[in-house]
């Protein structure tokens, strides 16, 4: 996960009203912090928005539109649900299937949504994997009608929901005249402008091999910083570790040479989706993907051997006690 080092000093806080709120939504702990005259009001509105989006997109809430869609195999989506499905299907194409919202039946076979973790048998996995292909999701963006080609298919927008939510929170902050803000949605960090004193926010990037320590710190303004790694959620069975980032190619936890991927972008939704996608791709494909889309995002890749790769767009803003290699276009 990425975490912010909160360094706004007391004198800055006097000039700017600070308001902060902690909440639990989307299966994670979140902290929203804003500075400005209407900070408290903005933070309260933002928290309401987060909870509304959670209720809309949750796969486990019987009243959510995604739950209903998964039950019925078809639906007319809300504007936001439709937008997210559209973005997800676009990412599916661009990442050549690495980002796949239809992987949900496979996630269930592993017990990740319910935390009833177990390694599925080969037959179950084969059966679920046959359903897991976003190519078989038919979505019409004009009518917002969606249907699945196979009855037992299910989707999960969890791979981009938090990134989208953080962008929406930023919109609320801007509408309420907030001059400076930082939010952490379960380690997804997004910032508005710099800190109240005008300096950069400093976002620490967690060490996947030793959570609680960091591989380095990013100095940023107005960016989303989102990290994915197998260390975030996993279980052990028969001495083996299985993490929650499933490779749609084989239905098993991705094991393609990376232990964590951090994405830095203006677009929270994109950053969220790509952090998972590049993790699944592995180091070579991930670097190639960045080179082809370097105008959209930057990245920090941590390989299985602990070596760190940083794309050149953020190399000057990343400080680390470890050596790192700069990925050039």
Task: State each model region's role.
Residues 1-329:
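Mature catalytic core of soluble alpha/beta enzymes
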């Amino acid at each position: 996960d990425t975490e912010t080092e909160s360094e706004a000093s007391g004198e800055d806080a006097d000039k700017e009203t600070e308001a902060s709120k902690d909440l639990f939504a989307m299966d994670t702990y979140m902290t929203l912090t804003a500075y400005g005259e209407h900070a408290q009001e903005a933070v309260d509105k933002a928290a309401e928005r987060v909870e509304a989006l959670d209720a809309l997109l949750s796969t486990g809430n019987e009243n959510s539109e995604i739950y209903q869609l998964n039950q019925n195999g078809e639906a007319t989506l809300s504007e936001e649900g439709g937008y997210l499905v559209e973005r997800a299907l676009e990412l599916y194409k661009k990442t050549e299937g690495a980002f796949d919202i239809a992987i949900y039946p496979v996630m269930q076979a592993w017990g990740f949504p319910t935390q009833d973790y177990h390694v599925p048998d080969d037959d179950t996995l084969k059966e679920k994997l046959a359903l897991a292909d976003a190519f078989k999701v038919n979505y019409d963006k004009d009518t917002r009608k969606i249907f699945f080609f196979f009855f037992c298919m299910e989707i999960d927008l969890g791979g981009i929901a938090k990134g989208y939510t953080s962008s929406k929170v930023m919109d609320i902050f801007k509408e309420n005249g907030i001059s400076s803000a930082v939010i952490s949605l379960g380690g997804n960090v997004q910032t508005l402008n710099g800190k109240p004193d005008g300096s950069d926010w400093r976002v620490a990037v967690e060490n996947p091999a030793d959570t609680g320590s960091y591989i380095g710190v990013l100095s940023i303004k107005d960016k989303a910083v989102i990290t994915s790694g197998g260390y975030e959620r996993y279980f052990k069975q028969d001495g083996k570790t299985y993490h929650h980032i499933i490779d749609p190619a084989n239905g098993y936890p991705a094991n393609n040479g990376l232990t964590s991927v951090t994405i830095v972008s203006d677009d929270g939704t994109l950053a969220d989706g790509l952090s998972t996608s590049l993790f699944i791709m592995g180091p070579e494909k991930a670097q190639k993907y960045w080179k082809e889309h370097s105008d959209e995002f930057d990245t920090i890749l941590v390989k299985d051997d602990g070596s760190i790769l940083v794309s050149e767009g953020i190399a000057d803003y990343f400080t680390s006690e470890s050596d790192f290699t700069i990925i050039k276009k």
